[in-house]
Amino acid sequence: MTEQPINTKKKNGDISKAPTPQNTPASVTNSYMRSKPPTVSTIQESNNEDGTGAAAAAGGLANNPVLLSMIQGKLGDLVGKQSGYIDNLSKPVKNRVYGLKSLQLNQMKLEAQFQKELLELEKKFFAKYQPLYVKRKQIINGELEPTVEEIEEGQQLEEEEKGIDKEDGEEEEEEEEDDEEEDEQGIPGFWLTALENLSTVSETITDRDSEVLSNLIDIRMEYLSTPGFQLIFEFKPNDFFENQTLTKTYHYQAELGYSGDFVYDHADGCEIRWKSKENNVTITIERRKQRNKTTKQTRTIEKLTPTESFFNFFDPPKPPKIKSEDDDNDDKLQDKEEANDDDEGEEGDEEDEELEARLELDYQLGEEIKDRLIPRAIDWFTGDAVDFDYPELEGEGDEDEYSDEDGEGDSDDDDDDDDEAAGSQKQPPPECKQQ
C-alpha cells in the first residue's frame, strides 16, 4: 500500500502580498523637501488626441533602420562606463584612492581566510551531528524506539511551543493510546511529508513523484574535499528504479566572489536506472497505432515526451561556458552581419533567460534541502517550520485588502486633479520615505 503524506501544512497568507519594507530617514527636518516645494515649472500639455508629433518621430525611426541601429549602438557603448570623475581627480586625491584600494584588498584577504576557517568549523560540528542524524534515521524507519527521557523532553517542548496544559496533554495522550496500531513501525511518509511542506520543493513534486518518494528512507549531506557538498537520497527497494541512493553534488569555485562568499560553479547529478519506461516519472508515453496501406499490418508507435518531475533534480542544467575575448569579438561581428535577423535573437534571449531560471531554481533547491530541510526535518514534517518561515504574514492579509480598496477610491478623484491649474503650488508631504 502506497504511503500518503500526512497533511500537516498550516494555512498562511500569500507571501506575494507581503508589504515591501521601507527605510525611513532618521530625520528630515533640514531636508529641502520640507523648506519649499519643487520649483520646476510645469508645462500645460495640449489636448492633441492625435499625438502627431510623437507618432511622426516614432514613424521616422521605424522607417530608418540604419539610424535606429546607430542610436542603439551608441547607447549600448555607454552602458557600464564611468563618468570620468575619478580620472579628473588631482594626483594627491588619486593617491588616497589608491591607498583605500590597498586597504580593501587586505580586508578581502581576511574575508577569504574567514570563509575558509568558517567552512572548517562547519565541517567540525557537522561530524558531531552525525550520530544524531543516524539515530533519527533509525527512529523514522522503525529500527529504534526513542527513550523515555527523549519522549518526555519532546512532549515538554511541544507543550511550551503550543501552550498546552499538562492535564489536557495527558487526556489527549490517553485517547491516542486507545487508537494505537501495534503493527505500524517508524513514521510512515516522513520525508515525503517534510518535502511537501517545504514550499520551493513541493512545487516540483507531482502526483507520480509522490508515489516514488514514499519509498524515501533518508536524506543526508556530505561535505566534499573541495568547496562544495553532496546530497544523498536513500530509498528502500521499490518498483520504480534499481538505485538504492540518488546523489546530487554541488561544486563551488576555488576563488571567493567579490562579496567574500563562495561562488556556485556547477552541479552533477546521477543516472537513474528506471526499471521500465512505464515507471519513469520524468517522461510521458503516448502510444498510437499505424496501419500499412499495402500490407494492412498494424504497428504501435511510442512517443516519449519529457515532463515536469522532482526527479529532474538529478539531471541538472549545465551553465553556459565562459567566452573568451576572441569569442566575444567574433560574436560582435556575427551580430552585425545578422542585425536584420531579429526573430532568432529574441529566441536566443528567451532560451538564455530560461536556462538562467533553471540554474537558479536548481541551486536554490539544493541550498534549501541542505540548510533548511536536513537540520530541521522534524519541524518540516510537523509543519512547525512553516510558521517560523514566514511569521510576519500573520494578520497582514486584511491590511492588503484595505489598501486595495483605498487605491480604487483614489481613482475617482483623478478627473478633479486634472482640472487644477498647472502653476498652483501644493504643500510638501510631512515625511519623506524611501523604499
From Swiss-Prot:
Annotated Gene Ontology cellular components are: cellular bud neck septin collar; cellular bud tip; chromatin; Gin4 complex; hyphal septin ring; nucleus
Q: Which GO terms describe its molecular function?
A: chromatin binding; cyclin binding; enzyme activator activity; histone binding; identical protein binding; unfolded protein binding
Where in this protein does the record say Phosphothreonine is found? 20, 24, 29, 42, 52
Q: Does the keyword Oxidoreductase apply?
A: no
User: According to the UniProt entry, which residue ranges have a biased composition of type Polar residues?
Assistant: 19-50
**Keywords of the record:** Phosphoprotein
Where is there biased composition of kind Basic and acidic residues? 356-374
Compositional bias (Acidic residues) at which positions? 146-185, 338-355, 386-421
InterPro entries of this UniProt entry?
NAP-like_sf, NAP_family
Q: Which residues carry this modification: Phosphoserine?
A: 16, 27, 31, 35, 46
Q: Which Pfam families match?
A: NAP (PF00956)
Q: Where is this region: Disordered?
A: 1-51, 146-187, 308-435
**Which superkingdom is the protein from?**
Eukaryota
Give the subcellular location. Bud neck; Bud tip
Which BP terms does GO give this entry? budding cell bud growth; hyphal growth; NLS-bearing protein import into nucleus; nucleosome assembly; nucleosome disassembly; positive regulation of microtubule polymerization; positive regulation of transcription elongation by RNA polymerase II; protein localization to cell division site after cytokinesis
Query: How is this chain modified after translation?
Result: Phosphorylation is cell cycle dependent and is important for its bud neck localization. Phosphorylation is highest in newly collected G1 cells, declines when the cells are traversing through the G1 phase, and reaches the lowest level around the time of bud emergence. Phosphorylation increases and remains high through the rest of the cell cycle until the beginning of the next one, when it decreases again. Phosphorylation involves two septin ring-associated kinases, CLA4 and GIN4, and its dephosphorylation occurs at the septin ring in a manner dependent on the phosphatases PP2A and CDC14.
The UniProt disruption phenotype note reads:
Leads to constitutive filamentous growth and abnormalities in both septin localization and organization. Exhibits greatly reduced virulence in a mouse model of systemic candidiasis.
Q: Which SUPFAM superfamilies does the UniProt record give?
A: NAP-like
Per the annotation, which location comes first and is thus the protein's main one? other
**What family does the entry list?**
Belongs to the nucleosome assembly protein (NAP) family.
Report quaternary structure and partners. Answer: Component of the GIN4 complex which forms a ring at the bud neck.
Its biological purpose is as follows:
Acidic protein, which assembles histones into an octamer. Involved in the regulation of the localization and the function of the septins during mitosis.
What protein does this entry describe? Nucleosome assembly protein 1
Q: Which organism is it from?
A: Candida albicans (strain SC5314 / ATCC MYA-2876)
